[in-house]
Amino acid sequence: MSAALETRDVGRFPEQVIETIDFLDGTTPERSPFASLVAMPSGNTSPEVFVLGSSPYGALLAAELGLPYTYAHFIGGDAVPILRMYRERFKPSARCDKPYAMMALAAIAAPSDEEAEELTWPVALWRLRLFRGDSSPVPSLAQTQAYPWTPLERSEVAATRRIIAGSPQSIRTAIETKIAEHGADEALIVTIAPDYGTRLRSYELIANALARTREVVAQV
């Protein structure tokens, strides 16, 4: 099914979302080329479907289809007008009877603010290379420190930074502030780090810091 859905035609995206939901719900029309496909393993429930986006397009699609919406804060800029539009245009559906907004946040935690800040630079270098067509893995701290940063590159990093970094307390304050500012129902935390151990430690620190706050979903 993934091969059949693979297309760069943005205009077909709404149709593809509907096809995916039908597939998950077992309600694919007989005339569909996917009618003979069966989701396995099957069960009595269907997974939740969120529309992830950072522009009005995804928000409007989620609102029109009555689906939860996840705003990709680590990509976009000002989420307030987009989430407002989503809530105002939302049409209740069998899957979701009222607007449900999630904030997807890039965050990295360390025992101290200073260490966390240092850990943002490998991610910055990785993104810089990615924009230049280099898809190599996230570099190590040593590789990042050895990289000959130019003033222009440093300014680009500062201008496009979308990551929350700090000690557990700093992270907790920053995430709670983001949720409150946008009236989000939930937060999803994404951590990119030079190695698995650093990434796992970050998730553990964030989870412990947010143990008594609103629901936070951390996916390792």
Where is each model-derived feature located?
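Hydrophobic faces of well-ordered beta-strands that scaffold small-molecule active sites
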Residues: 48-52, 67-72, 99-106, 187-190
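Acidic/polar active-site rim loop that often engages polyanionic ligands
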Residues: 1-5, 64-65
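An alpha-helical appendage that flanks or caps ligand/catalytic pockets
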Residues: 5-38, 78-184, 211-220
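Glycine-rich, proline-tolerant flexible connector loops at the mouths of alpha/beta enzymes
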Residues: 73-75, 190-198
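Substrate-access "cap/lid" subdomains that shape
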Residues: 31-49, 70
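Short glycine/threonine-rich loop-to-helix capping motif typified by GTGT followed
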Residues: 112, 197-205
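Active-site mouth loops of central-metabolism enzymes
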Residues: 43-53, 159-168
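A conserved active-site cap/scaffold subdomain adjacent to cofactor or substrate pockets
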Residues: 54-79, 83
